[in-house]
């Protein structure tokens, strides 16, 4: 364990000047023609993203997050004319994502509510057209749940909630783009391999990949695996406290197939992560493995990785393969083919990486937890990387350019 206590890191030490014109408001026309910064053991160079496969070791395992962004912004107009925005955050009833999108007639979500002061009481109502039939959607506000509200939705007809949000929802693009969602975002703000609905923000490192780049990875002998972490709105939550001890990470829900964990074991517990969401999931698997080594009787909910868990010193450290094997044995004892759990892990300087050996990621906001994750990975060399990107005309944030980090 590193001697740094990340709780006392000052977020102001992770600031840098980011002019608005360097924030990519739209993606470039061809995803894989974005620029690629390569950081290799302290040396920095640049290339084009479609050449990524040639920088990766043959036979390596690359892990992608296959979550799909949902049209989470729903608008209702009150009889008074007031516009209320209901932003879906997390399923409440049913709480399972897959069941939620299949459900008909009624469901409940934890949501952020915009223009809340105008919604004192009563239900919101909106008529929409689905497959030629008129469907009336009602929304009723329930109890406060942290900073979000429970919203109960009800509607008529044999229509799933997935169809409801496809018809009336709007794709939530990042707030720092400072523009309205456009029709093109429905395509460009999804990865080409997105499958499992549930995120309210894209795992943007994956936006550069095309079918051609994926085929080229295969041709280079790179093995590919997928996992699912549903990205929450908290990914844009600024760090407002002076020290990061005062910042609470949001809980994110993860699903990992048994086969993927076996593949990680076959690769000596090492992986190339596509994006910070894949990093958080992979590194959380290590701590889940430590938990079941200590107590094999735990259930899935008890595998949740708390924010500061890696830094407490309570967990005996071990090789990543041993932790993954313990997790696999725990799954097999329960005949589980997919692990469903959650993580709140914060990765910051002072963190020792266990599974992720290379990282593909975009350029992140100043003073963000994602920048802390990158700094922990490149052992503080983030200044060198970001100075290079700023001086070589790289585009920043969600629709910006990419980097391959090899510490």
List the model feature ranges, each with a label:
Residues 1-407:
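Surface-exposed, charge/polar-rich loops and edge strands
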């Amino acid at each position: 364990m590193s001697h740094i206590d990340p709780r006392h890191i000052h977020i102001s030490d992770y600031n840098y000047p980011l002019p608005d014109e360097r924030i990519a408001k739209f993606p470039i026309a061809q995803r894989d023609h974005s620029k690629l910064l390569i950081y290799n053991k302290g040396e920095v160079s640049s290339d084009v993203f479609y050449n990524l496969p040639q920088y990766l070791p043959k036979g390596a395992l690359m892990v992608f997050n296959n979550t799909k962004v949902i049209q989470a912004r729903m608008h209702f107009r009150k009889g008074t004319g007031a516009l209320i925005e209901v932003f879906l955050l997390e399923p409440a009833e049913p709480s399972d994502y897959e069941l939620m999108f299949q459900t008909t007639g009624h469901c409940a979500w934890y949501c952020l509510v915009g223009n809340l002061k105008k919604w004192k009481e009563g239900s919101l109502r909106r008529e929409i057209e689905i497959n030629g039939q008129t469907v009336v959607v009602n929304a009723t506000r329930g109890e406060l749940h942290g900073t979000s509200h429970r919203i109960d939705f009800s509607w008529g007809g044999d229509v799933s909630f997935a169809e409801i949000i496809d018809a009336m929802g709007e794709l939530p693009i990042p707030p720092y783009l400072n523009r309205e969602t456009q029709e093109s975002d429905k395509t460009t703000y999804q990865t080409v391999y997105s499958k499992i609905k549930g995120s309210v923000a894209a795992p943007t490192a994956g936006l550069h990949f095309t079918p051609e780049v994926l085929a080229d990875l295969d041709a280079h002998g790179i093995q590919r695996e997928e996992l699912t972490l549903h990205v929450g709105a908290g990914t844009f939550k600024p760090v407002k406290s002076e020290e990061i001890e005062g910042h609470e990470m949001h809980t994110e829900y993860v699903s990992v197939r048994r086969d993927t964990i076996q593949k990680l074991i076959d690769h000596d517990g090492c992986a190339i992560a596509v994006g910070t969401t894949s990093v958080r999931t992979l590194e959380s698997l290590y701590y889940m493995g430590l938990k079941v080594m200590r107590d094999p009787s735990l259930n899935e909910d008890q595998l949740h990785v708390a924010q500061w868990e890696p830094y407490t010193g309570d967990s005996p450290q071990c090789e990543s393969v041993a932790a993954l094997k313990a997790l696999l044995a725990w799954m097999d004892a329960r005949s589980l083919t997919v692990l469903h759990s959650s993580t709140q892990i914060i990765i910051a300087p002072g963190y020792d990486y266990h599974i992720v050996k290379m990282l593909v990621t975009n350029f992140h906001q100043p003073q963000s937890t994602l920048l802390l994750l990158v700094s922990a990975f490149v052992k503080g060399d983030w200044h060198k990387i970001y100075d290079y990107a700023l001086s070589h005309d790289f585009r920043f944030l969600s629709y910006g350019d990419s980097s391959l980090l090899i510490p």
